[in-house]
C-alpha cells in the first residue's frame, strides 16, 4: 500500500508546487522554507542522503530567490517548479523512513500551503464546470 500512497504523494506535491508558481518568489520562497524544515527532520532522523538533498535544494533556492522577487529577472518555469515539488516530496519521504509520528505530520504541515492551494483550485474548477485537467 505504501507504493501507491507514495506515488500519489509525489505527484500531488509536485503539481502543487507547479500550481503556486504564478507569483514572483512564492514557489521558490516557500520551497526554501519547506526544504529547510525537511532537512532538519532528516538530520534528526540521521538520514544523511536527505540532509544532503535538502541542503542542496535549500541553497539553490536561496541563491535563486533574489532574482525572482518583483520585478523578477528570471523565472522558474514549469521545469523549475516541478523539480522543486519533486525534490520536496522525495525529501519528505526520506525523512519519514526512520522517524515516526513527527516525520509523518511535519511534512504534511510544511506542505499544507501548496496542497491546500491545489485542492482549492480543483474545487473552484469543479464548481465552475471546467475540467480539472
How would you label these PLM feature ranges?
Residues 17-18, 93:
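Helix-capping/transition residues at the boundaries of transmembrane alpha-helices
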Amino acid at each position: 500500500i505504501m507504493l501507491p500512497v507514495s506515488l500519489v504523494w509525489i505527484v500531488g506535491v509536485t503539481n502543487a508546487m507547479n500550481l503556486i508558481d504564478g507569483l514572483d518568489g512564492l514557489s521558490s520562497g516557500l520551497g526554501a522554507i519547506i526544504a529547510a524544515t525537511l532537512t532538519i527532520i532528516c538530520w534528526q532522523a540521521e538520514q544523511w542522503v536527505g540532509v544532503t538533498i535538502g541542503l542542496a535544494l535549500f541553497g539553490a533556492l536561496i541563491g535563486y530567490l533574489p532574482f525572482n522577487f518583483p520585478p523578477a529577472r528570471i523565472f522558474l518555469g514549469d521545469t523549475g517548479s516541478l523539480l522543486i515539488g519533486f525534490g520536496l516530496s522525495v525529501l519528505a519521504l526520506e525523512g519519514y523512513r526512520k522517524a515516526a509520528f513527527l516525520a509523518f505530520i511535519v511534512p504534511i504541515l510544511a506542505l499544507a500551503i501548496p496542497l491546500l492551494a491545489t485542492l482549492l483550485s480543483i474545487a473552484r474548477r469543479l464548481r465552475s464546470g471546467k475540467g480539472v485537467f
